Structure formats: structure tokens, C-alpha cells
């Protein structure tokens, strides 16, 4: 009976061996200490045999945040054996605001996790992303100047409100002065100095060039006769010229205000905040000083 089961299972084990040999050749089983360099990419996964594939580059934390900077290509070099495992130096072109924190190369053991042989192409990098001194300064300056959120809009709204209040007061004063000038110029009646009025008989006193006594029974006010009749005229002195000058000045001022482009301080959902460049050039955090090749050092983790 035992021999029968052995005969039945023998083809099955033979098929497993053939499948194993076909899928994983001896070249896929490499000694970890012999690996000198590995190049890892952000958009690729590792090879896997006993476990699931993992990303070749994986951020696991850090005070900069994993989304602050995503390296596209990292190259790790074998820097020697410490008696326990391989030590690595991983290098990447990185903004001066960031640096590697903890780095650890993770490889899949070929037959078991602690196997000194690993599956070729199964190594990936786990790292933390930290802020440099420059990065911390840029972050602090950015929070102070922009507010990052409601503080940003609140501070700009307050400054705009104060500017609006001041300009509204000036405009109101201008409007009052303009209204007064218009009233004096057009609405108030001209002052008449001893202007004669024609009498009820239709007699035109303007044809006379000298004064004479009024007829008996008539008052001198009615007939318009007076000693100063010949010099009577409408007063168009300081009131007229003051109103005219005020209107001209106000027209010039309002014309200049209309000629200046309007710039709203509020957020535009299509283009972002619509402040002018001059309003923000002193509020922006300092720009990065550049990019350099950053290095991180760490050991090996098996899986």
C-alpha cells in the first residue's frame, strides 16, 4: 500500500521540481555579501518568491513628511560586512532642505528569512526623510509669512480691510467736497447786487445810464432806481472759481484711480491668490539654495 502511494506521488514531486527549476534558476540565488551595488526606482517593485513584491523605494516617516520629496532613483553601495550583515551607503540627488534619516536595505532570503543567499532583484530600500537646518528655517519662515491656511487669508483680509477703510474715508471726503462744489456752482442762485427790475408798465431801466427820481407814489425799491444802478451785476467771483478748481482737481484724482488696475487680495479658485508680486515679494519664504547628492547609511533587513 505504501509503495502504491509513493508511486502515485512521485510524478507530483517531480513536476514540482521541474517547475521550481524552470521558475528560479541558480543565477537567481545570490550571496548577499557578493552584491556590490543595487539601483532602485520609485515606480518599480521588487522580485518575490516566498512573499509578495514590495516597492523598491518606500518612505516610512520622518519630520519632513514622505510627500515633501519623492526620490526617483536611489543607488546603494555595499560598504562592507560588520560581522552580522552588509552595511550600505545609499545616495540620491536631493534638495538641500532634506536628508536621509534612517535607511535600511530589505532583501528576501531565498529559502528562509535569514538565508545568507537572497533572491536576485528582491532588495528594496526603506528610509525616513528628515529636514535639514535649511529646511527647518524655510518651513518656519513659510508658516510665519503665509500662515498656511486660514491664517493666510485672515491676515490678508485684515490688511485689505484696513486699506479699504482708509481709502473709503478719503473717497467719502472727496465726494462731500465735490457735492458742495456742484451745489455752489449750479444749484445756489447767483447773488444780485442792486439789479434793477422792470416796472409794471414795461419800462426798461437798462436803457438809462443815469439815475432819476422815482415817480410820485412809487417806492425806489420797486422802480429799481438807486445811486448805484449803473454798476449792478451778477456776482461770479470766488465762489465760481473755487467750485471750478475743486471739480478739476477731483476729476484728475478720480481719473488716476480709475487708470490704476484693480487687484483683489482674495483667493481666486482658478489662478490662486491674486495679490501683486510687489505685495508678496517680502512675504515669501527664502528659496532653496539648490540640490546636492545626499547620502544615508544603514544595514540590511531580511524578509
UniProtKB/Swiss-Prot annotation:
InterPro entries: SARAF
Membrane-topology descriptor: Single-pass type I membrane protein
Function: Negative regulator of store-operated Ca(2+) entry (SOCE) involved in protecting cells from Ca(2+) overfilling. In response to cytosolic Ca(2+) elevation after endoplasmic reticulum Ca(2+) refilling, promotes a slow inactivation of STIM (stim1 or stim2)-dependent SOCE activity.
Positions of region (Disordered): 195-224, 265-303
Entry keyword Signal: yes
Signal peptide annotation: 1-23
GO cellular component, one term: endoplasmic reticulum-plasma membrane contact site
Main location: endoplasmic reticulum
Classification via PANTHER family: STORE-OPERATED CALCIUM ENTRY-ASSOCIATED REGULATORY FACTOR (PTHR15929:SF0)
Cytoplasmic side: 190-303
Spans through the membrane: 169-189
GO BP terms: calcium ion transport; regulation of store-operated calcium entry
Keywords: Calcium, Calcium transport, Endoplasmic reticulum, Ion transport, Membrane, Signal, Transmembrane, Transmembrane helix, Transport
Family to which the UniProt record says this protein belongs: Belongs to the SARAF family.
Lineage: Eukaryota, Metazoa, Chordata, Craniata, Vertebrata
Bias (Polar residues): 265-276
Name of the gene this protein is made from: saraf
Ranges in the topological domain labelled Lumenal: 24-168
Native organism: Xenopus laevis (African clawed frog)
UniProt protein name: Store-operated calcium entry-associated regulatory factor
Compartments where found: Endoplasmic reticulum membrane
Source species, domain of life: Eukaryota
Amino acid at each position: 500500500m505504501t509503495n502504491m502511494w509513493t508511486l502515485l506521488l512521485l510524478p507530483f514531486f517531480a513536476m514540482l521540481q521541474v517547475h521550481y527549476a524552470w521558475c528560479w534558476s541558480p543565477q537567481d540565488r545570490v550571496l548577499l555579501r557578493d552584491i556590490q551595488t543595487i539601483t532602485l526606482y520609485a515606480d518599480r517593485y521588487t522580485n518575490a518568491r516566498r512573499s509578495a513584491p514590495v516597492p523598491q523605494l518606500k518612505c516610512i516617516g520622518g519630520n519632513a513628511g514622505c510627500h515633501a520629496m519623492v526620490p526617483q532613483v536611489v543607488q546603494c553601495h555595499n560598504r562592507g560586512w560588520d560581522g552580522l550583515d552588509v552595511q550600505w551607503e545609499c545616495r540620491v540627488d536631493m534638495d538641500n532642505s532634506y536628508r536621509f534619516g534612517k535607511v535600511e536595505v530589505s532583501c528576501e532570503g531565498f529559502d528562509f528569512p535569514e538565508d545568507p543567499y537572497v533572491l536576485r532583484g528582491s532588495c528594496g530600500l526603506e528610509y525616513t526623510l528628515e529636514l535639514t537646518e535649511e529646511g527647518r528655517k524655510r518651513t518656519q519662515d513659510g508658516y510665519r509669512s503665509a500662515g498656511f491656511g486660514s491664517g493666510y487669508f485672515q491676515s490678508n483680509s485684515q490688511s485689505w480691510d484696513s486699506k479699504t477703510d482708509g481709502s473709503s474715508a478719503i473717497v467719502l471726503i472727496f465726494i462731500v467736497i465735490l457735492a458742495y462744489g456742484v451745489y455752489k456752482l449750479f444749484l445756489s442762485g447767483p447773488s444780485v447786487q442792486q439789479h434793477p427790475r422792470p416796472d409794471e408798465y414795461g419800462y426798461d431801466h437798462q436803457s438809462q445810464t443815469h439815475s432819476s427820481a422815482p415817480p410820485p407814489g412809487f417806492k425806489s425799491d420797486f422802480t429799481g432806481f438807486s445811486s448805484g444802478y449803473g454798476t449792478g451785476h451778477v456776482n461770479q467771483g470766488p465762489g465760481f472759481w473755487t467750485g471750478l478748481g475743486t471739480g478739476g482737481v477731483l476729476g484728475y484724482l478720480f481719473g488716476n484711480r480709475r487708470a490704476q488696475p484693480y487687484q483683489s487680495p482674495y483667493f481666486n479658485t482658478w489662478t490662486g491668490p491674486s495679490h501683486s508680486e510687489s505685495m508678496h515679494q517680502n512675504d515669501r519664504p527664502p528659496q532653496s539654495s539648490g540640490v546636492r547628492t545626499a547620502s544615508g547609511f544603514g544595514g540590511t533587513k531580511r524578509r
